[in-house]
């Protein structure tokens, strides 16, 4: 059974590995369905992550800052003017509106034309909004000029990358595998390498077309020019906001000024009285200075990132991402395709890497590329070999795999002449549990059942007596009865109910087992292990399994069989059954006659040797032997008082033959037998 379970686990593992390898290597119909669904849900990304970061830094962040300034101006008054106390409400509103429009600091003793202006504080939010719109112009030009051509190029590239992998997996790799298998097991590594190199030289027309396409893209630079122009334009346009914001941050520090309202209206008409001056304050100046500083730092940082990216892209970058993996699928990328780094291959490689979720075979291609020490064909060949091995009809032998299944019928202690242990090749089948006629024996917790019975009768504990001479005398009789029953069973019987299979008997008694054995208290004395006599035969069931009083009288001493004679069939009303395997041997419940009969025959060695075997009325043993003292005490309780002998001679005397039937209850399954003296 252990070997069968191991075999089942090995086959399940092999099947699972085969399915995984099949999904890994061969393209299936699920790829086409997934590709069609992905084409509907996913769109090509025509902007790189770096370009999105630049757009956010130069456009979106300034717009957010402008929104913050406008929110503050609308939430509270943009200017505070402290008018004289004799101004009415309308006069105060007029003074505040006039000063917010004028925004000129009326310095005393200075000509009015030379008064400094604070108009930049009012214009700054609108300037930031204009700068954000200007910085979005390069991204908008890239969207209009390069999106159409870039979309067509990417669609062709992504589809061809998938096709290249599929052609290699379906065509070239199986072809190499067949050629290697045709050489036989004696093929060398050099021959394998030659087969792989010859297969690499054989290319399909589609592969040649794709290589020509890559070569042409390596010599053109249209997309490279557009990409470079986009970022250079960003650098040039960013100079304007940086210059303006730097000037504003350096010069516009004043947030309080004096506003000249003109002559007082209360003065005489036509007279030039003193002008009225009002002190004013701009509360948003500090916030605008902070926003200007943040915008300056952000634009400078974006320009630095753009410069580093352009230098890396067109000067120092050597990797082409996805195109570097094409040599694993038979597409040879040549460096002479690129006359310089300033070509479309670099731009297309970045966008293919960004749209790699459209490549259905990308994970398989990455798996092959990670095996840098092996060529693609060697990797696929090994995977296909493992797939074929998992689909084989027999279990891999010792040479095919490191797992072997040794024949369980072979004794490992006996050395065999062969060098290798025998290996059993079993066909691959679905394992099913087949019930047999000889089920495994279940453990029988006898001691636990005895403890439960003893715990249920704690109200009247019985003292434990020592082993008496009567126990010693009964033991040979029990052995003789067991031997007689065994002899009778071996001699054969009728072909009726006695031919019931033992398995059914075991199931039956296991099903009807009960622990309700009142009113006895069972002892936990274990049987001797030196001599194991055969099990006593058991009757069928308790329903009608006891003899009536007339049948008991009809048996008598004359019907008792001798020591060696088999028991007649009429003395056993029911066919016998073997005892349960979990019970101790000879563990029947025997009932003896009470010591009230006046028998004076003394014990002697001669009488002991000629003792007749007992007439057997047995049941399947469910508990160990009842102590004989317990049976005497039970009889004394039924008669109303103890019947102790007057002297030791009465204790050792043998009572006349009398058959007493115990276990008048219905539920428990016990063994009842008679003892004759």
From Swiss-Prot:
Chain positions covered by the region annotation Disordered: 394-425, 485-512
Topology versus the membrane: Multi-pass membrane protein
GO BP: any one term: monoatomic cation transport
Positions on the Extracellular side per record topology: 75-125, 252-295
Principal location: membrane
Phosphoserine: residues bearing it: 593, 604
Residues linked to a glycan: 86
Taxonomy, superkingdom: Eukaryota
Expression tissues: Expression is enriched in central nervous system. Expressed in suprabasal layers of skin epidermis.
UniProt keyword annotations, A-Z: Cell membrane, Endoplasmic reticulum, Glycoprotein, Golgi apparatus, Ion channel, Ion transport, Membrane, Phosphoprotein, Transmembrane, Transmembrane helix, Transport
Catalytic activity, reaction form: ATP(in) = ATP(out); chloride(in) = chloride(out); iodide(out) = iodide(in); Na(+)(in) = Na(+)(out)
Function statement: Ion channel with a slight anion preference. Also able to release ATP. Plays a role in regulating neurogenesis and apoptosis in keratinocytes.
Family designation: Belongs to the pannexin family.
Protein name as it appears in the record: Pannexin-2
């Amino acid at each position: 059974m252990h070997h069968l379970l191991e075999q089942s686990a090995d086959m399940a593992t092999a099947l699972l590995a085969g399915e995984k390898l099949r999904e890994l290597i061969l393209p299936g119909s699920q790829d086409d369905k997934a590709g069609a669904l992905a084409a509907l849900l996913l769109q090509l990304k025509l902007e790189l992550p770096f370009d999105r970061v630049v757009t956010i830094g130069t456009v979106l962040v300034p717009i957010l800052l402008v929104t913050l300034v406008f929110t503050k101006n609308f939430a509270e008054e943009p200017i505070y003017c402290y008018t004289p106390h004799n101004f009415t409400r309308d006069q105060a509103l007029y003074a505040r509106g006039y000063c917010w429009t004028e925004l000129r600091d009326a310095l005393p003793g200075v000509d009015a034309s030379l008064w400094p202006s604070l108009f930049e504080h009012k214009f700054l939010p609108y300037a930031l909004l204009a700068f954000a719109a200007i910085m979005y112009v390069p991204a908008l030009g890239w969207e209009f000029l390069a999106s159409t051509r870039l979309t067509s190029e990417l669609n062709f590239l992504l589809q061809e990358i998938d096709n290249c992998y599929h052609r290699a997996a379906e065509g070239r790799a199986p072809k190499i595998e067949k050629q290697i298998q045709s050489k036989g097991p004696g093929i060398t590594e050099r021959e394998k390498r030659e087969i792989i190199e010859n297969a690499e030289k054989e290319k399909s027309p589609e592969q040649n077309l794709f290589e020509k396409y890559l070569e042409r893209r390596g010599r053109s630079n249209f997309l490279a020019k557009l990409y470079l122009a986009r970022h250079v334009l960003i650098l040039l346009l960013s100079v304007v906001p940086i210059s303006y914001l730097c000037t504003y941050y350096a010069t516009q520090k004043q947030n309080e000024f004096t506003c000249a309202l003109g002559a007082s209206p209360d003065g005489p008409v036509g007279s030039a009285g003193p002008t009225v001056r009002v002190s004013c304050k701009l509360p948003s100046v500090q916030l605008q200075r902070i926003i200007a500083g943040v915008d300056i730092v952000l634009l400078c940082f974006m320009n630095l990132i753009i410069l580093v990216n352009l230098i890396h892209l067109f000067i120092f970058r050597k990797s082409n991402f996805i195109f570097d993996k094409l040599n694993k699928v038979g597409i040879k990328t040549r460096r002479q395709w690129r006359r310089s780094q300033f070509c479309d291959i670099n731009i297309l490689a970045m966008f293919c890497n960004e749209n790699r979720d459209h490549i259905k075979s990308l994970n398989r291609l990455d798996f092959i590329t990670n095996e840098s020490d092996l060529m693609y064909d060697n990797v696929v060949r090994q995977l296909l070999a493992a797939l074929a091995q998992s689909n084989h009809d027999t279990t891999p032998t010792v040479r095919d795999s490191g797992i072997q299944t040794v024949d369980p019928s072979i004794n490992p202690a006996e050395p065999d002449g062969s060098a290798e242990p025998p290996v059993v090749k079993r066909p691959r089948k679905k394992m099913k549990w087949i019930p047999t006629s000889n089920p495994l024996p279940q453990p029988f917790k006898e001691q636990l059942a005895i403890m439960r019975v003893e715990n249920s009768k704690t109200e009247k504990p019985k003292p434990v007596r020592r082993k008496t001479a009567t126990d010693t005398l009964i033991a040979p009789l029990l052995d003789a009865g067991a031997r007689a029953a065994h002899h009778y069973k071996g001699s054969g019987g009728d072909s009726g109910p006695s031919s019931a299979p033992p398995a059914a008997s075991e199931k039956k008694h296991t099903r009807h087992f009960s622990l309700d054995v009142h009113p006895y208290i069972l002892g936990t004395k274990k049987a001797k292990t030196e001599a194991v006599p055969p099990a006593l035969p058991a009757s069928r069931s308790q329903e009608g399994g006891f003899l009536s009083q007339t049948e008991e009288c009809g048996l008598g001493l004359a019907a008792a069989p001798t020591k060696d004679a088999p028991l007649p069939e009429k003395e056993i009303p029911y066919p016998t059954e073997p005892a349960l395997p979990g019970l101790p041997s000879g563990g029947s419940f025997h009932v003896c006659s009470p010591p009230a009969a006046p028998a004076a025959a003394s014990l002697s060695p001669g009488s002991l040797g000629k003792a007749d075997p007992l007439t057997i009325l047995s049941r399947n043993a469910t508990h160990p032997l009842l102590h004989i003292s317990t049976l005497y005490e039970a009889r004394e309780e039924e008669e109303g008082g103890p019947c102790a002998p007057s002297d030791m001679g009465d204790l050792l005397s043998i009572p006349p033959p009398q058959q007493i039937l115990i276990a008048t209850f219905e539920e428990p399954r016990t063994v009842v037998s008679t003892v004759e003296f």
